[in-house]
From Swiss-Prot:
CDD domains: Lumazine_synthase-I. The active site is at residue 90. Catalyzes the formation of 6,7-dimethyl-8-ribityllumazine by condensation of 5-amino-6-(D-ribitylamino)uracil with 3,4-dihydroxy-2-butanone 4-phosphate. This is the penultimate step in the biosynthesis of riboflavin. Belongs to the DMRL synthase family. Keywords: Riboflavin biosynthesis, Transferase. The lineage of its organism: Bacteria, Pseudomonadati, Pseudomonadota, Alphaproteobacteria, Hyphomicrobiales. This is 6,7-dimethyl-8-ribityllumazine synthase 1. GO terms for molecular function: 6,7-dimethyl-8-ribityllumazine synthase activity.
Length: 157
């Protein structure tokens, strides 16, 4: 399995898409929307895959640490994944903690993150949100990250 795919051109915003592949087909749809939005905007990106939504914030933190040590610097991040409610409390933990950790990272590190982690009751709701022809939440998250990159630059952060 390739854990890093790259599309990179000079002088364009460069983002890291971190996708949780717990539900492969839904992950494909979210990623398709995010990549299309970034391509349309002329942005470049790398894609890394993680097992689930809880691993997304840590991966972004790894990327930030790597940049501090001479690795790739990213202008922003796109978090993609799907959490579907089951019969246990696990849904609430994953939904709340992944969102909280992304918010903490964005505020504490002053970074642009587009949150495209779907938190839904069932697979039908997930598909409506993931498909580009419906709500296109992958594309929405990518556009949100680009907007936040612009605001960060505007304020000189």
């Amino acid at each position: 399995m390739d854990f890093l795919m790259s599309k990179h051109e000079a002088d364009a915003p460069h983002l890291l898409i971190v996708e949780a592949r717990f539900y492969d087909d839904l992950a494909d749809a979210l990623l398709d929307g995010a990549k299309a939005a970034l391509d349309e905007a002329g942005a470049t990106y790398d894609v890394v895959t993680v097992p689930g939504a809880l691993e997304i914030p840590a991966t972004i933190s790894f990327a930030l640490d790597g940049a501090d040590n001479g690795g790739t610097e990213y202008d922003g991040f796109v978090a993609l994944g799907t959490v579907i409610r089951g019969e246990t409390y696990h849904f609430d933990i994953v939904s709340n903690e992944s969102c909280r950790a992304l918010t903490d990272l964005s505020v504490e590190e002053s970074i642009a993150i587009g949150n495209g982690i779907l938190t839904v009751e069932n697979e039908e709701q997930a598909w409506v949100r993931a498909r580009r022809e419906d709500k296109d939440k992958g594309g929405f998250a990518a556009r949100a990250a680009l907007t936040m990159i612009g605001l960060r630059k505007k304020f000189g952060a």
